[in-house]
Amino acid sequence: MAFVKSGWLLRQSTILKRWKKNWFDLWSDGHLIYYDDQTRQNIEDKVHMPMDCINIRTGQECRDTQPPDGKSKDCMLQIVCRDGKTISLCAESTDDCLAWKFTLQDSRTNTAYVGSAVMTDETSVVSSPPPYTAYAAPAPEQAYGYGPYGGAYPPGTQVVYAANGQAYAVPYQYPYAGLYGQQPANQVIIRERYRDNDSDLALGMLAGAATGMALGSLFWVF
């Protein structure tokens, strides 16, 4: 950060309206700082021109003030601040007054200063678009044209036949097999009765013996 303009100016006090000589520095960030003297040890006040200043008057435009002894009003300038404060200044000459006026006006309106730059950065951050995505993942409705079926299919019917010819039906619940899984169907199961008594076993042996004797007689004839 560097000086834009420096020099002596007469400043009128706000209470006693007396003129006092101060050293002024205008910095490149738009701050106008004035000191007791050129050593810059004691700061009396400072003004941020881009943010605090709303108008600059020169010469006959200056209000509610009179120039110091030996100076004309054309050497005067006033810095009107946003908070209502007015800083009345007087330069060494008319040319010096105009030089200060143009420099201060430029620092107040130049967007390269820090105050305006910060506002520009905040605006760009707020209004910046979201990051670009080359291949966005489609939603399930867009990929397939319909959403997945979330419910279970209705249960099928299981029909069971006993060996005595009687049939009875029981519900059979199929688990959900996905979007393209197997659909439920009706199943038929024939279940034979288990023979575990002695009479059934004897009848089977007798029938086998009779069959063997008949076959033996047939072979004996030939």
Swiss-Prot record:
GO molecular function: phosphatidylinositol-3,4,5-trisphosphate binding
GO cellular component, one term: recycling endosome membrane
Bilayer topology: Peripheral membrane protein
Pfam families recorded: PH (PF00169)
Keywords: Endosome, Membrane
Protein location: Recycling endosome membrane
Annotated function: Involved in retrograde transport of recycling endosomes.
PANTHER family attached to this UniProt entry: EXPRESSED PROTEIN (PTHR14309), PLECKSTRIN HOMOLOGY DOMAIN-CONTAINING FAMILY B MEMBER 2 (PTHR14309:SF8)
Domain note: The PH domain specifically binds phosphatidylserine, which is enriched in recycling endosome membranes, it doesn't recognize PIPs.
Name of this protein: Pleckstrin homology domain-containing family B member 2
